[in-house]
Swiss-Prot record:
Taxonomic superkingdom: Bacteria
Gene, per the UniProt record: purA
Organism of derivation: Corynebacterium ammoniagenes (Brevibacterium ammoniagenes)
UniProt binding sites for GTP: 12-18, 40-42, 304, 330-332, 412-414
Annotated Gene3D superfamilies: Adenylosuccinate Synthetase, subunit A, domain 1, Adenylosuccinate Synthetase, subunit A, domain 2, Adenylosuccinate Synthetase, subunit A, domain 3
Gene Ontology CC terms, in alphabetical order: cytoplasm
Residue positions binding substrate: 298-304
Protein name: Adenylosuccinate synthetase
Annotated active site: 13, 41
Pathway given in the UniProt record: Purine metabolism; AMP biosynthesis via de novo pathway; AMP from IMP: step 1/2
Catalysed reactions, as listed in the record: IMP + L-aspartate + GTP = N(6)-(1,2-dicarboxyethyl)-AMP + GDP + phosphate + 2 H(+)
Length: 430
């Protein structure tokens, strides 16, 4: 029995989909415990590239059962569009399970998300506009609509009417928009009821029963540590907890059942949207990382901001997630660049910080303190063992391991499933 949680260690787009795809073929369940269709990931299988947004990467595994956990917020239109797109390419989505306790994203959530971002202007967070934040806000305010509610029309209608009592006041009086008819929302949800019903289960019970039977469960966190609503660069964060603790809450798998916490981290750093980013590059190297690394957001289409590896963030992520292992991705992107700077600490108004500063104001003003290492010139995309890597590449990985305080168990040397070096296999360890 193993319960493994996968967590992004930076600001997202680290390659969690690849990690899930590699491990997902050897586990019995792959669970998405948080987020919605706001966090895309790319998986390359058999030379074909799949871009997933709401569904877990385990949907492409032939054996694993994919699950959307209770912590996910689900846009039904986006869900079935994604399913249909995969099925058109020959994928089998019939094994998908959805928690009855997951919350639903309503059309009014998307409307409010877009209107509020425009209203904020320069103070906007930079959301995807897909209604994720408003859906989570309703969940916490206890006025959200859950998956199970669409199977009882009277409860559904009552919840929608109650939610729109307040939201229509906001739309009309604050944002000068038209009120939304509750009946159109009820009809929208009911139109998906028959297709949804076969997928809905008590996922918490099913997952724990599977673990009791000695099966393997992989939890695939969305977004990343630095976007966590509590532990990230607030307020430039998502609306859920995409850290290891959040995976437990969003799946119903208790924390003592988690055997490995696997952090996914790039050999450099990227970020999409607004917010502080100490190692961000504005020169030719930033453009090089964007171009060579293919740094364009799957979900937003926005070019990612790029910077050097930040070991302060890596240590912080290891601590708040209890990482047992790291999966280092995109090492190949750094081939042939001469020297590679590594951020080892911050300078904030003349004071050195080896760990995360206490306040967001300090973090916003943090300047990176770098050490440099020589890059390698050799093509590493065909390397299959750590020993096959050029010595300079090995030295770089070992230095990141030392600075991060967590072993680098997997190393990505290309986008393909088979372009991964395995130093320690979490599924072979107790």
């Amino acid at each position: 029995m193993a319960a493994i949680v996968i967590v992004g260690a930076q600001w997202g787009d680290e390659g969690k989909g690849k990690a899930t795809d590699i491990l997902g073929g050897r586990v019995d369940y792959v669970v998405k415990p948080n987020g919605g269709n706001n966090a895309g990931h790319t998986v390359v299988v058999g030379g074909e590239k799949y871009e997933l947004k709401l569904l877990p990467a385990g949907i492409l595994s032939e054996n694993a059962v994919p699950v959307l956990g209770n912590g996910v917020v689900i846009n039904l239109e986006a869900l079935f569009e994604e399913i249909e797109g995969l099925e058109a390419r020959g994928a089998d989505a019939s094994r998908l399970r959805i928690s009855a306790n997951a919350h639903l994203v309503a059309p009014y959530h998307q409307t409010l998300d877009r209107v509020q971002e425009r209203f904020l202007g320069k103070r906007a967070i930079g959301t995807t506009g897909r209604g994720i934040g408003p859906a989570y806000a309703d969940k916490v305010a206890r006025v959200g609509v859950r998956v199970q509610d669409i199977f009882d029309e009277s409860i559904l209608r009552q919840k929608v009417e109650s939610a729109l009592d307040i939201k229509n006041q906001m739309l009309v009086k604050m944002y000068n928009r038209k009120a939304i008819d509750p009946e159109t929302i009820v009809e929208y949800f009911l139109s998906y009821r028959d297709r949804l019903e076969p997928m809905v289960v008590d996922s918490e019970y099913e997952l724990n029963t599977a673990l009791d039977a000695g099966k393997h469960v992989l939890m695939e966190g969305g977004q990343a540590t630095m976007l966590d609503v509590d532990h990230g660069t607030y307020p430039f964060v998502t609306s859920s907890n995409p850290t290891a603790g959040g995976a437990s809450v969003g799946s119903g798998v208790g924390p003592t059942r988690i055997t490995h916490s696997l952090g996914i981290i790039k050999a450099y750093t990227t970020r999409v949207g607004a917010g502080p980013f100490p190692t961000e590059l504005f020169d030719k190297w930033g453009e090089y990382l964007q171009t060579t690394g293919g740094e364009v957001g799957v979900n937003t289409g926005r070019t990612r901001r790029c910077g050097w590896y930040d070991s302060v963030i890596a240590r912080y992520a290891s601590r708040v997630n209890g990482f047992t292992d790291y999966f280092l991705t995109k090492l190949d992107v750094l081939t042939g660049i001469g020297e590679i700077p590594i951020c080892v600490a911050y300078d904030v108004d003349g004071e050195r910080f080896d760990e995360m500063p206490l306040t967001q104001s300090q973090f916003h003003h943090a300047q990176p303190i770098y050490e440099t290492m020589p890059a390698w010139e050799e093509d590493i995309t065909g390397c299959t063992t750590f020993e096959e890597l050029p010595q300079k590449a090995q030295d770089y990985v070992l230095r990141l391991e030392e600075l991060s305080g967590t072993r680098m168990s997997y190393i990505g040397v290309g986008p393909g499933r088979d372009q991964t070096i395995v130093r320690h296999d979490v599924l072979d360890e107790k």
